[in-house]
C-alpha cells in the first residue's frame, strides 16, 4: 500500500508547477522549454522518484525538499510562486513528513534553513510581498519549533533569528508583519531557552574558535541611505516590480534583480568577516523621520502580572532543581573529540575573576553556504547518533547548542544598551521583551557563559534604563530586573545593592519632572521583591550584616514607613504599596510562627535528627520552594543548591555530603576547581550565623563607619579610634591595616594615598602593595589595578616611593622580564606620563598627544641600555590611549560610571561578593524587632486616615499579625505599643461621657478597633504589660457610659436582700427637697446637658447606643476577668497594678470609678485563688490604703470593706494563705472608729458569713483574737485597740505615697510599747503564768514581706508578757462590766454579731481552750452593749459628733459635667451604705426593743451553754493533748483554771444582765445565775474560789442592784433585789464549810452584813425590810448551830471575837434581832435548830417581796490608795482614773486590823458607806486577823473576776427549782 504522504507531496508539486506554468512567461510555452527550465525539470524528476516508491522513508528528505527549496531560492520566481513553495514546505514540516530519525534529516534541515533565510523573489506590490515575508516567518517558526528543528546547526539558528529580527526592526514594513515577526521571535526564544538545561557548557577554546560565525549585529538592520535612493519604477504595471524593503534597485535594462532578505547587505549569507567598525558604519537607525511613514510602536507587551512567572511552559525550573539534573542526558559529542578539541570541565563559578565577555576569535573559519549538507552524522535530541555509511569529505553538521543561545543572549543584551545610538526605542523594548521571555523560560544562572553576560552588560544596561523617562521601557526593565534578582541574586550581590539604591532614589527624589507613575512602579518593584520568600532576610544578612555594604533593609524599612504617611493627608497608591511592603515581613513572619505553633513535637524531633548541624542554604529559585519550612524556621536545603556547590562538570555532591557541619561543606567546595575561598562569607563563623553573631557584626559595622569617617578626615585619628574599639590591634599590624585599606570602599582614596605614601609608614606601604596579585599581568595592566586603589599624590618624591614599591612587587610576581628594577621603574613612570599626556585636558590644549613613535623614542635604551620589546610598548600604548587609567573620584560622567561599575565587578569577584541564601523563617525575630515600630506606626496612620473597608481590614489584619508574632516571641513592649495604638481608635478615651454611647455607636471603625483590642487582650494577655492601663481606661469609660454588661456592674453584697447591688446608681428623682429645687432651676435655665436629658434621647442616639451595647457584648470584656487565671504571673501583676492605679491618691478622684476598679481587682484575685499568694501583697496593700486612709465614710470604703471580707470568705479554705488573710482582717481594726461604725452592717453580715463557712479553718488563737475583736468593735462599738489606732494614725500622712514594698513594718520591740490600757482578756489571766512570745509565726512572716504587723497582743492581749515596765494607774477589778468604753453601736450589727457568736458557741467543735476566753470576753462586751436595751449606746450615738467631710483626704472630682454624669443617687447607697445618724436615731424606737430583748436572751442562753460545757471542753482538749503529746502551751482542766478562765467571767456576764433595766431580762438572768451557781461542776471549787465568787460576782451584783436601774419598774426592782439577796445567803450557807477555812472569813461575813443593812433600807416597800431579817436569822442560826461563833480558845466554848463583831454590825440596823434570836446570854446553848439550818433558810427564800425601796444616790467614792492594787492589777484598759467607776459603788479602805467599837452610829447616818462600822470602836480589843488587802472587795468596781468552784453538799435537800 502506497504511503499517503507521497500523495501529499505529489499534490503540492502539482500546485507549484501549475503556478509556475501559469506565470506570464509560460503563456506560449513548448515542451522543449519545460525540459530546459531547471525548476520544472527538478519537479519532473521528483515525480518519477515518487512514483517508484511506496514508502516516503525510502528516500532522503533532501530529495523531495530540493525542488521546492530551489523555487524559494530562485530569483526569477514571483512572490506568489515563492509563497506557494513556502506553504508546501511548511506543510511538510507541520505534517511531520520529515522523519527526525532519518539519517539525512539534518542535511535537509540545514538546506531548508539556508534556502528560506536566503529566499529571493520578484516583487509585485508591497502587500503581496509582505504576504511572502509572512510565510517566510511562518516556515522559520515551524522549522525551529518542530522536533526536526533540533538538527539545525548553531549557524542556521542564528541566521533564522537574524532574519526574524530584520523583519521586526524594518520600519518600512507594516506593523502587522513586524508584530508577527515579534511573536515569532518570542516563540523561538522561549523554545531555545527552554532547551537550555539540555545543553552542556562548551570549553572556552571551542567557543572562541566558533564564535566568529555566529555574530549577530545589533543596530539598524538596513542602511537608511539606501532607502533614500530607492525610487518607484516607471515601467508598465505588468513588468513593474514593487521593491520590497531592502530589495535591490531595478537595473536600467529592465531585468529584475533578486530581492534578498539581507537588504542588499552581506549580512548572513556572505561568509567574509565584517569588522565591527564597518558594520556599524553600514547600519543606521531607522527613525520615524524616514519616508517609511510608519510610527514607532510604543505599546509595551510586558504587562503580565509578575506573579505568573511559574508557568507550565517553563520546565527549566522544575528540572533544574532535581539532584543530578544539571545535565539532562546530552552526552559529550564524539565529533568534537574527532576535531581534536578537548572537552574540559566548566568552572563552577566565575566569581573570582571579573566576568569578561569572551573575545571574538580572529581566526578565519570560512563556512560556505553550499557546503555539502549530505555528509554528516545526525544526533537526535536524545543524543542517539546516526552515522551515514558513505560519509564524504567535509565536516559533520553539529546540532545547535549553547553557542547560539549565548550569541542570541548577547545580541538581546546589546539591543538594550541605551547609549548605543543605533538602538531605537522599539529595539530596546524588543530586547527587553525577549530577555523577559528568556529569563521566564530557563534557569539562566546555571549557565556560566550567560551568567558572565548578566553580571556585566545586562545589569548595566538595565540600570541605565531606569533613568529613562519612557515609562514602557522603564516598566519593562523593572520586570527583567525582578526576574534576575528573583532567580539569581546569589550571583549579583552588588548589582542588587545598586538596583535597590536606584529604586530608593527614584522613590525619594523630589524632582517635579519625575512622573508619579515611576515612583509607583519603583515601589511596586520593591514590594514584589519583598514578597519573595526569604528575600528580606537575605537583604538583612548580606547587606545590613556586611561591614562594607549599605544597611539596605534598615534604610528600606525607614523609607517605606516614611512613605506610608501621606503628607497631604490623602492616601494614594504609593502609600498603600509602602504599607504592603512593610506588611510582607509581618505576613511571612506570622505564617512561620503559625507553622511553628501547629507543628507537632514529634515532627520537630524527626527533623532534628535529619537536619545537618550547620544548616544548608536553599539556593534554588524561591518561587519553586513556596511551601513553608520546618517549624523551627530552618529548611534543609539540597547541597546542590548552595552557591558554589555546583562542582566542576555540572556534577553535584552526593546527598549525604554537607551534613556534618560547616567545615565539611567548605571542604567540599574547596575540593572543586576554585580553591580561592569557601562559599561562606568570611565574616560569618557558619553558613547560618546565630543572631548574637549578627548583632556583634552590626555593632562592629557602626564602629567601622565611624572609624572610616574619622580616617577620611585624618587617617591617624581613624586608625587610633579603631584600635581603641578593638577592631585593629595595638600596636598597629601593617598587614591588618593594609587589608582594611583595600577592603573598605568607603575610604577616601586621596587619604589612602597620603597615608600609605607617608615616609613614616614605609612598612605599611610594603604590606599594602603585597595585597595586590600581579601574576600574569602586563606592567600597564598591573599599574592600572594599583593606581585605582588610591589617588596618586602630586609630589615627585611621594610618587617615586609608591612606584618603587609597585615595581618591586610586580617583579616579584612576574620574575624579571626587564634588565633591572630601574628599567621596570622607568617603564612604569613612562606609562603614567603617557596616561596624563593622552587624557589630561590641560596637557592636550598645549601639546598634541604623544604618538606611538614618540613613546618608543622616549624609552629608547632604558632597559639596561637596550630597548624594550616593541610589541609590548605598542600594546601598552594602545591600551592607555584607548582606555584611560582612571584616577579615582576625579572623573565624572560615563568615565566615572565605567570606573564605578568596574569596581563593583571587582568586589563581586572577591569573597566579599558571596551572597548567602537563607532558608525561610531564619532570623524572623531580628527582622521583626527592626520593623515592628515603623509598621505599627504606618498601620495606625493608614487605619486612621482610610475610609475604605478593605484598607481598614488590611490594617487590622496587620495589627493582629503583629500581635501574634509578639506573643510568639514574648515581646511585651511590641504588644503594649500595639494595644496603646489601637486604644486610641476606639474613641473611648477622648469622648465625653454624655456623647460616648452615640459617638461610639455610630463609628464602625471604633467598633473594629474595640473588638480587636479586646480580642487581642483575651488571646495574648500573657504578654500585656503597660497596655493594661489603656484597656482599663477603656473599660472605665464604658462603665461611666453605662455600656458594660450587667454582670460586670453587679457586685456581691452582704446586706442587700438579693445578695447583689449595682455599682451604677440608677437615675432616680432626687430624694431631698433642696435637690429637687436645684434640678428645677437647672431645667428652667435650660443648661445644655440637662436640656437634652429632659427632652430624652433621639432615635438616632438610641439606635447608636443599641449598636454600641451590641458591640461591647461581642467584645466580651468580662472574659478579661474570668480568664485572668490563665495569665502569666507578670502580666497578672501588671493588670492588678493598672486597677490599683485608679485609687484616691491624688487630690481628686472619682468614687464610682475607683469602686468599679476595686471590684474588678477583687474578682481577679478570686479567679486566681490557686496562686493568690503571689498577688496577695498588692491587693492587701490596696485595701489597707482604702480603708485605713479614709477620713470619712464613703461608698468606696464600704466596697473595700466588703471586698476584704469577700476575699477572706473565699480564701480561708486555702491553707497556704489563710493565716495572711486572717491577719489582713486587722485592717478593719485600723480604720477610724467613726468610719468603721458606718460600715458595721456590712462587716457584721460579712463576718457572719465568714464564720458560717470557714470557722473550721480558723485554728490559731491569734486569728480568733482578730475575729472576736472585730465582732466586739462592730457589735458593741468598742474602739479598736489603741495601739493599732496609733500606728494607723502615724502612717496616715504618708501611706498614700508608699509603694508596695514601703509599707511600714514594725519590729518586735515596737509592739511592746506601753499602750496605756489593759486589754480585756488580761483581766482573766493568771498573773503568775510565764510570759509568751507576743506574735505568731504568721506575724513574723508578714514582717518580712513589708506589711504592717499587728501582734495578737495589740488586738487582744490575752496572754501578756511579764516584761511590761512601769507602773500603771489602777482600775477596779471587781466589777461586773468589762470596763471598756463602748461607743455607739448599730442594733442590727449587734444582732448579727450575736448570731455569729451563737453559731460558734452552739457548735462544740469551734470552741477550744484557745478561743474560749476570747469568746467569753466578747459575750460580756455584748452583754454590756445590750444592757438596758442598748440605751448607753443610744445616748452616746446621740452625743457623738458628726464627722466633717471637709477634712476628708479623698475628695471627689469636681469636674465639669460630673453632676450630669451622676444625676443618679442611689437610695441603697445612701441609706444602707451611709447609715446616717439621723436615720439610725429615727429607726431605733420602732423595732429596737424586740430585737434587743432577743439579743439579751440569746446572750444569756449562750453564756449558760458555755458555762455548762466549759469543763468538758477543757478536759477533752487536755486529754487529747496528753494523748498526742503535742508541744505548745499545756492545757489545764483543773477547777482553778476553769474558774479563772471560764466560770467566773461567765457568771459575771450573767450577773451583769441581772442589772438590766428590763424586768424580763433581769428575772431571766437571775434564774440563769442561780442555776449556774448551783451547777454540779462548781461544787469542786475550794474556799478561795468561792470567796472570789462573792467578791467578783455576787457583791458587785448586789452593789449594782442598789442603784435605781429601772425607775419606772419599782416593784420589779424590789423583787430583783430580794431574789439577789436571797441568792447571796443561799450560796453563803451552801458553801459555809469551805468558807470557814478562809483567814478572811470575818471580812466576808461583815461585807454580807453590810449588804443586808443596805438592802433593808433600799426599798420603799416592806418587801425587803421583812425578807432581809428573815434571811439574816437563817444565816445566824445556821452559823450558830455550826458553832462558828464559839471561840476555840475559850474554855467551855465562850463567844468568839466574830460573835462580837457580828452583833456590833447587826445592831446598827437590827438592834432587836439579837434579843429575838438569842434570849439566853450563854452562847454555848444555841437555839434548838436543825444543825444545817435549812428550813429557816428555805422559809427565808419563800418570803414574798413587795414594796418599793429606793436607794438614794451615793456621792462619788474616794480614789483607791495606790498601794492597794499595784501588785495585783495589770495596766488599766484606758487612761481614765479609777474614780470613773459607776456611781454608787462603795469603796473601802483596808485597815490593818479590826477594832470593834461598843456603840455604833445611828442606823441611817451613812447608809452607803458600809465600811464605816468596821472602823467603829466595836472592833477595839478584837484580836488582829490576818486579812489580805482585799478586806472588803465587794466595794471595789473591777473587771477581772476570780474563779469560784465548789462541790455541792450531798446533804443539801433543796432542789434548784426552789430558787426560781
From Swiss-Prot:
Outcome reported for the amino acid change (mutating residue 1338 to A): Prevents 2-DG-induced Golgi disassembly
Sequence segments annotated as region (Phosphatidylinositol-phosphate binding): 887-1371
Low complexity: compositionally biased ranges: 1285-1297, 1775-1792
Annotated positions of the Phosphothreonine modification: 508, 1338
GO BP term, example: cellular response to virus
Pfam families: Sec7, Sec7-like_HUS, TPR_28
Tissue distribution of the protein: Ubiquitous.
Compositionally biased spans, kind Polar residues: 250-262, 290-301, 335-351, 1298-1311, 1465-1474
Effect after changing residue 983 to Y: In CMT2GG; uncertain significance
Segments forming domain SEC7: 693-883
Main subcellular location: Golgi
Record's subcellular location: Golgi apparatus, cis-Golgi network; Endoplasmic reticulum-Golgi intermediate compartment; Golgi apparatus, trans-Golgi network; Golgi apparatus
Effect of residue 795 to D: Inhibits Golgi membrane recruitment of GGA1, GGA2 and GGA3; generates misprocessing of PSAP
Role summary: Guanine-nucleotide exchange factor (GEF) for members of the Arf family of small GTPases involved in trafficking in the early secretory pathway; its GEF activity initiates the coating of nascent vesicles via the localized generation of activated ARFs through replacement of GDP with GTP. Recruitment to cis-Golgi membranes requires membrane association of Arf-GDP and can be regulated by ARF1, ARF3, ARF4 and ARF5.
Subunit structure: Can form homodimers and probably homotetramers. Interacts with COPG1; the interaction is independent of ARF1 activation. Interacts with ARF1, ARF3, ARF4 and ARF5. Interacts with RAB1B (GTP-bound form); required for GBF1 membrane association. Interacts with GGA1, GGA2 and GGA3. Interacts with USO1. Interacts (via SEC7 domain) with PNPLA2 (via C-terminus); the interaction is direct. Interacts with ARMH3. (Microbial infection) Interacts with poliovirus protein 3A.
Domain topic, free-text comment: The DCB (dimerization and cyclophilin-binding) and HUS (homology upstream of Sec7) domains are necessary for dimerization. The DCB domain is proposed to support constitutive homodimerization; the HUS domain interacts with the DCB domain which may occur intramolecular or intermolecular.
Protein name listed in UniProt: Golgi-specific brefeldin A-resistance guanine nucleotide exchange factor 1
Lineage of the organism: Eukaryota, Metazoa, Chordata, Craniata, Vertebrata
Amino acid at each position: 500500500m502506497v504511503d499517503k504522504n507521497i500523495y501529499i507531496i505529489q499534490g503540492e508539486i502539482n500546485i507549484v508547477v501549475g503556478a509556475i506554468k501559469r506565470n506570464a512567461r509560460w503563456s506560449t510555452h513548448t515542451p522543449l522549454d519545460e525540459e530546459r527550465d531547471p525548476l520544472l525539470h527538478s519537479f519532473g524528476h521528483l515525480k518519477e522518484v515518487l512514483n517508484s516508491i511506496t514508502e516516503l522513508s525510502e528516500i532522503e528528505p533532501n530529495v523531495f525538499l530540493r525542488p521546492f527549496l530551489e523555487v524559494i531560492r530562485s530569483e526569477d520566481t514571483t512572490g506568489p510562486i515563492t509563497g506557494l513553495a513556502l506553504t508546501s514546505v511548511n506543510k511538510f514540516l507541520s505534517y511531520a513528513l520529515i522523519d527526525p530519525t532519518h539519517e539525512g534529516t539534518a542535511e535537509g534541515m540545514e538546506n531548508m534553513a539556508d534556502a528560506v533565510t536566503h529566499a529571493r523573489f520578484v516583487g509585485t506590490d508591497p502587500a503581496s510581498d509582505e504576504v511572502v515575508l509572512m510565510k517566510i516567518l511562518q516556515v522559520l517558526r515551524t522549522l525551529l519549533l518542530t522536533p526536526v528543528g533540533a538538527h539545525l546547526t548553531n549557524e542556521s539558528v542564528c541566521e533564522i533569528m537574524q532574519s526574524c529580527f530584520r523583519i521586526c526592526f524594518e520600519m518600512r514594513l507594516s506593523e502587522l508583519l513586524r508584530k508577527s515577526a515579534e511573536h515569532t521571535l518570542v516563540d523561538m526564544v522561549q523554545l531555545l531557552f527552554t532547551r537550555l538545561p539540555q545543553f552542556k557548557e562548551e570549553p572556552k577554546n571551542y567557543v572562541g574558535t566558533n564564535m566568529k560565525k555566529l555574530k549577530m549585529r545589533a543596530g539598524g538592520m538596513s542602511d537608511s541611505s539606501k532607502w533614500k535612493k530607492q525610487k518607484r519604477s516607471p515601467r508598465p504595471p505588468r513588468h513593474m516590480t514593487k521593491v520590497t524593503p531592502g530589495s535591490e534597485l531595478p537595473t536600467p535594462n529592465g531585468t529584475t534583480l533578486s530581492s534578498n532578505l539581507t537588504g542588499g547587505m552581506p549580512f548572513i549569507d556572505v561568509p567574509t568577516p565584517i569588522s565591527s567598525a564597518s558594520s556599524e558604519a553600514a547600519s543606521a537607525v531607522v527613525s520615524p523621520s524616514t519616508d517609511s511613514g510608519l510610527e514607532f510602536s510604543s505599546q509595551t507587551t510586558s504587562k503580565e502580572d509578575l506573579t505568573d512567572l511559574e508557568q507550565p511552559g517553563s520546565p527549566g525550573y522544575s528540572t533544574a532543581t532535581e539532584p543530578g539534573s544539571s545535565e539532562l542526558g546530552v552526552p559529550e559529542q564524539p565529533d568534537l573529540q574527532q576535531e581534536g578539541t578537548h572537552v574540559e570541565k566548566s568552572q563552577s563559578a566565575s566569581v573570582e575573576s571579573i566576568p569578561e565577555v569572551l573575545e571574538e576569535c580572529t581566526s578565519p573559519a570560512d563556512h560556505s553556504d553550499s557546503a555539502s549538507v549530505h555528509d554528516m552524522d545526525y544526533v537526535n535530541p536524545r543524543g542517539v547518533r546516526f552515522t551515514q555509511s558513505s560519509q564524504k569529505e567535509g565536516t559533520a553538521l553539529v546540532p545547535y547548542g549553547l553557542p547560539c543561545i549565548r550569541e542570541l543572549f548577547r545580541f538581546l543584551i546589546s539591543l538594550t544598551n541605551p547609549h548605543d545610538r543605533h538602538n531605537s526605542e522599539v529595539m530596546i523594548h524588543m530586547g527587553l521583551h525577549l530577555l523577559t521571555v528568556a529569563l521566564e523560560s530557563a534557569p539562566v544562572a546555571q549557565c556560566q557563559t550567560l551568567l558572565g553576560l548578566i553580571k556585566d552588560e545586562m545589569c548595566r544596561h538595565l540600570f541605565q534604563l531606569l533613568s529613562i523617562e519612557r515609562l514602557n521601557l522603564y516598566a519593562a526593565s523593572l520586570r527583567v530586573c525582578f526576574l534576575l534578582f528573583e532567580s539569581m541574586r546569589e550571583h549579583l550581590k552588588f548589582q542588587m545593592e545598586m538596583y535597590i539604591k536606584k529604586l530608593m532614589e527614584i522613590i525619594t527624589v523630589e524632582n517635579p519632572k519625575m512622573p508619579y507613575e515611576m515612583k509607583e512602579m519603583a515601589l511596586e518593584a520593591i514590594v514584589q521583591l519583598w514578597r519573595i520568600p526569604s528575600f528580606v532576610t537575605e537583604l538583612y544578612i548580606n547587606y545590613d550584616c556586611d561591614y562594607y555594604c549599605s544597611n539596605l533593609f534598615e534604610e528600606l524599612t525607614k523609607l517605606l514607613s516614611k512613605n506610608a504617611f501621606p503628607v497631604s493627608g490623602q492616601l494614594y497608591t504609593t502609600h498603600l504599596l509602602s504599607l504592603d511592603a512593610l506588611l510582607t515581613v509581618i505576613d511571612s513572619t506570622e505564617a512561620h510562627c503559625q507553622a511553628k505553633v501547629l507543628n507537632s513535637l514529634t515532627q520537630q524531633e524527626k527533623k532534628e535528627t535529619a537536619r545537618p548541624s550547620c544548616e544548608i542554604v536553599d539556593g534554588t529559585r524561591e518561587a519553586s520552594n513556596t511551601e513553608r519550612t520546618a517549624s523551627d524556621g530552618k529548611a534543609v536545603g539540597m547541597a546542590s543548591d548552595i552557591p558554589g556547590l555546583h562542582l566542576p562538570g555540572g556534577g553535584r555532591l552526593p546527598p549525604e555530603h554537607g551534613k556534618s557541619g560547616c567545615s565539611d561543606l567548605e571542604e567540599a567546595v574547596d575540593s572543586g576547581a576554585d580553591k580561592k575561598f569557601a562559599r561562606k562569607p568570611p565574616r560569618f563563623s557558619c553558613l547560618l550565623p546565630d543572631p548574637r553573631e549578627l548583632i556583634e557584626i552590626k555593632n562592629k559595622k557602626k564602629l567601622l563607619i565611624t572609624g572610616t569617617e574619622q580616617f577620611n578626615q585624618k587617617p591617624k585619628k581613624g586608625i587610633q579610634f579603631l584600635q581603641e574599639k578593638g577592631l585593629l590591634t595595638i600596636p598597629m599590624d601593617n598587614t591588618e591595616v593594609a587589608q582594611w585599606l583595600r577592603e573598605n570602599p568607603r575610604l577616601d582614596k586621596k587619604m589612602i594615598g597620603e597615608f600609605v605614601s607617608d615616609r613614616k609608614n614605609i612598612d605599611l606601604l610594603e604590606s599594602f602593595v603585597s595585597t595586590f596579585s600581579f601574576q600574569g599581568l602586563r606592567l600597564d595592566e598591573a599599574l592600572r589595578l594599583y593606581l585605582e586603589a588610591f589617588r596618586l599624590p602630586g609630589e615627585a618624591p611621594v610618587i617615586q616611593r609608591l612606584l618603587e614599591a609597585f615595581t618591586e612587587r610586580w617583579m616579584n610576581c612576574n620574575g624579571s622580564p626587564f634588565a633591572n628594577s630601574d628599567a621596570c621603574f622607568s617603564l612604569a613612570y613612562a606609562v603614567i606620563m603617557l596616561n596624563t599626556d593622552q587624557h589630561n585636558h590641560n596637557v592636550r590644549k598645549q601639546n598634541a598627544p604623544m604618538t606611538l613613535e614618540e613613546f618608543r623614542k622616549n624609552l629608547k635604551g632604558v632597559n639596561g641600555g637596550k630597548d624594550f620589546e616593541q610589541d609590548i610598548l605598542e600594546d601598552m600604548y594602545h591600551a592607555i590611549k584607548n582606555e584611560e587609567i582612571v584616577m579615582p573620584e576625579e572623573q565624572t560622567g560615563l568615565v566615572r560610571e565605567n570606573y564605578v561599575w568596574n569596581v563593583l565587578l571587582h568586589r563581586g569577584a572577591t569573597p566579599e561578593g558571596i551572597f548567602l541564601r537563607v532558608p525561610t523563617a531564619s532570623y524572623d525575630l531580628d527582622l521583626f524587632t527592626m520593623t515592628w515600630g515603623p509598621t505599627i506606626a504606618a498601620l495606625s496612620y493608614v487605619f486612621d486616615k482610610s475610609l475604605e473597608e478593605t484598607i481598614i481590614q488590611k490594617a487590622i489584619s496587620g495589627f493582629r499579625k503583629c500581635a501574634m508574632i509578639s506573643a510568639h516571641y514574648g515581646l511585651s513592649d511590641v504588644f503594649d505599643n500595639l494595644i496603646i495604638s489601637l486604644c486610641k481608635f476606639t474613641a473611648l478615651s477622648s469622648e465625653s461621657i454624655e456623647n460616648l454611647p452615640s459617638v461610639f455607636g455610630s463609628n464602625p471603625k471604633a467598633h473594629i478597633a474595640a473588638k480587636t483590642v479586646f480580642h487581642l487582650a483575651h488571646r495574648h494577655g500573657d504578654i500585656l504589660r503597660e497596655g493594661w492601663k489603656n484597656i482599663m481606661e477603656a473599660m472605665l469609660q464604658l462603665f461611666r457610659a453605662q455600656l458594660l454588661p450587667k454582670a460586670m456592674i453587679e457586685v456581691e453584697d452582704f446586706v442587700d436582700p438579693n445578695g447583689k447591688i449595682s455599682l451604677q446608681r440608677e437615675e432616680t428623682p432626687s430624694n431631698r427637697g433642696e435637690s429637687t429645687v436645684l434640678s428645677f432651676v437647672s431645667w428652667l435655665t435650660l443648661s445644655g446637658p440637662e436640656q437634652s436629658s429632659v427632652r430624652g434621647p433621639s432615635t438616632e442616639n438610641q439606635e447608636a447606643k443599641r449598636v454600641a451595647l451590641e458591640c461591647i457584648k461581642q467584645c466580651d470584656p468580662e472574659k478579661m476577668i474570668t480568664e485572668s487565671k490563665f495569665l502569666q504571673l507578670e502580666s497578672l501583676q501588671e493588670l492588678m497594678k493598672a486597677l490599683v492605679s485608679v485609687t484616691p491618691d491624688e487630690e481628686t478622684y472619682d468614687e464610682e470609678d475607683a469602686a468599679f476598679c476595686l471590684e474588678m481587682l477583687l474578682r481577679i484575685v478570686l479567679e486566681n485563688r490557686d496562686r493568690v499568694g503571689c498577688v496577695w501583697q498588692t491587693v492587701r496593700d490596696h485595701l489597707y490604703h482604702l480603708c485605713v486612709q479614709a477620713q470619712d465614710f464613703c461608698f468606696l470604703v464600704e466596697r473595700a470593706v466588703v471586698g476584704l471580707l469577700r476575699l477572706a470568705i473565699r480564701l480561708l479554705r486555702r491553707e497556704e494563705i489563710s493565716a495572711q488573710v486572717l491577719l489582713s482582717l486587722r485592717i478593719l481594726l485600723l480604720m477610724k472608729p467613726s468610719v468603721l461604725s458606718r460600715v458595721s452592717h456590712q462587716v457584721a453580715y460579712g463576718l457572719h458569713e465568714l464564720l458560717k463557712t470557714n470557722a473550721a479553718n480558723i485554728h490559731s488563737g491569734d486569728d480568733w483574737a482578730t475575729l472576736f475583736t472585730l465582732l466586739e468593735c462592730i457589735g458593741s462599738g468598742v474602739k479598736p485597740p489603741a495601739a493599732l489606732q496609733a500606728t494607723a494614725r502615724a502612717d496616715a500622712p504618708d501611706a498614700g505615697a508608699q509603694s508596695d514594698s514601703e509599707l511600714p513594718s514594725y519590729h518586735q520591740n515596737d509592739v511592746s510599747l506601753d499602750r496605756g490600757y489593759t486589754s480585756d482578756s488580761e483581766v482573766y489571766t493568771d498573773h503568775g503564768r510565764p510570759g509568751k512570745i507576743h506574735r505568731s509565726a504568721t506575724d513574723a512572716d508578714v514582717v518580712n514581706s513589708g506589711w504592717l504587723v499587728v501582734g495578737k497582743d495589740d488586738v487582744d492581749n490575752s496572754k501578756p508578757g511579764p516584761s511590761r515596765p512601769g507602773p500603771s494607774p489602777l482600775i477596779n477589778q471587781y466589777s461586773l462590766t468589762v470596763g471598756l468604753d463602748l461607743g455607739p453601736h448599730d442594733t442590727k450589727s449587734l444582732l448579727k454579731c450575736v448570731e455569729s457568736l451563737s453559731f460558734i458557741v452552739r457548735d462544740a467543735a469551734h470552741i477550744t481552750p484557745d478561743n474560749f476566753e476570747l469568746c467569753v470576753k466578747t459575750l460580756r462586751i455584748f452583754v454590756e452593749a445590750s444592757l438596758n436595751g442598748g440605751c448607753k449606746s443610744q445616748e452616746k450615738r446621740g452625743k457623738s459628733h458628726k464627722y466633717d467631710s471637709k477634712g476628708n483626704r479623698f475628695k471627689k472630682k469636681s469636674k465639669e459635667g460630673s453632676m450630669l454624669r451622676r444625676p443618679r443617687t442611689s437610695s441603697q447607697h445612701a441609706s444602707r451604705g451611709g447609715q446616717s445618724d439621723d436615720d439610725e436615731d429615727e429607726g431605733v424606737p420602732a423595732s429596737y426593743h424586740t430585737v434587743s430583748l432577743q439579743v439579751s436572751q440569746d446572750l444569756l442562753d449562750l453564756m449558760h451553754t458555755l458555762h455548762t460545757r466549759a469543763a468538758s471542753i477543757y478536759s477533752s482538749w487536755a486529754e487529747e493533748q496528753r494523748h498526742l503529746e503535742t508541744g505548745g502551751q499545756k492545757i489545764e482542766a483543773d477547777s482553778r483554771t476553769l474558774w479563772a478562765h471560764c466560770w467566773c467571767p461567765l457568771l459575771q456576764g450573767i450577773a451583769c444582765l441581772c442589772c438590766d433595766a428590763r424586768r424580763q431580762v433581769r428575772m431571766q438572768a437571775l434564774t440563769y445565775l442561780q442555776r449556774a451557781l448551783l451547777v454540779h461542776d462548781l461544787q469542786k471549787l475550794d474556799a478561795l474560789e468561792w470567796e472570789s465568787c462573792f467578791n467578783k460576782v455576787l457583791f458587785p451584783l448586789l452593789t449594782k442592784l442598789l442603784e435605781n436601774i429601772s425607775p419606772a419598774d419599782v416593784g420589779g426592782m424590789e423583787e430583783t433585789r430580794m431574789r439577789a439577796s436571797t441568792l447571796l445567803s443561799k450560796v453563803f450557807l451552801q458553801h459555809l464549810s469551805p468558807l470557814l477555812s478562809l483567814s478572811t472569813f470575818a471580812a466576808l461575813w461583815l461585807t454580807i452584813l453590810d449588804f443586808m443593812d443596805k438592802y433593808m433600807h433600799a426599798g420603799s416597800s416592806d418587801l425587803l425590810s421583812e425578807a432581809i431579817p428573815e434571811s439574816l436569822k437563817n444565816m445566824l442560826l445556821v452559823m450558830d448551830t455550826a458553832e462558828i461563833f464559839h471561840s476555840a480558845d475559850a474554855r467551855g466554848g465562850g463567844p468568839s471575837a466574830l460573835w462580837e463583831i457580828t452583833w456590833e454590825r447587826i445592831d446598827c440596823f437590827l438592834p432587836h434581832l439579837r434579843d429575838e434570836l438569842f434570849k439566853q446570854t450563854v452562847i454555848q446553848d444555841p437555839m434548838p435548830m436543825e444543825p444545817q439550818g435549812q428550813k429557816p433558810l428555805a422559809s427565808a427564800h419563800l418570803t414574798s417581796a413587795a414594796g418599793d425601796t429606793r436607794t438614794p444616790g451615793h456621792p462619788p467614792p474616794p480614789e483607791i490608795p495606790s498601794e492597794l492594787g499595784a501588785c495585783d492589777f495589770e495596766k488599766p484598759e484606758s487612761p481614765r482614773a479609777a474614780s470613773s467607776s459607776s456611781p454608787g459603788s462603795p469603796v473601802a479602805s483596808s485597815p490593818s486590823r479590826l477594832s470593834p467599837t461598843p456603840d455604833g452610829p445611828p442606823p441611817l447616818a451613812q447608809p452607803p458607806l458600809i465600811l464605816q462600822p468596821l472602823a467603829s470602836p466595836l472592833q477595839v480589843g478584837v484580836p488582829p486577823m490576818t486579812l489580805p488587802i482585799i478586806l472588803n472587795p465587794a466595794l471595789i468596781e473591777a473587771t477581772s473576776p476570780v474563779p469560784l468552784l465548789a462541790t455541792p453538799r450531798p446533804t443539801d435537800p433543796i432542789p434548784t427549782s426552789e430558787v426560781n
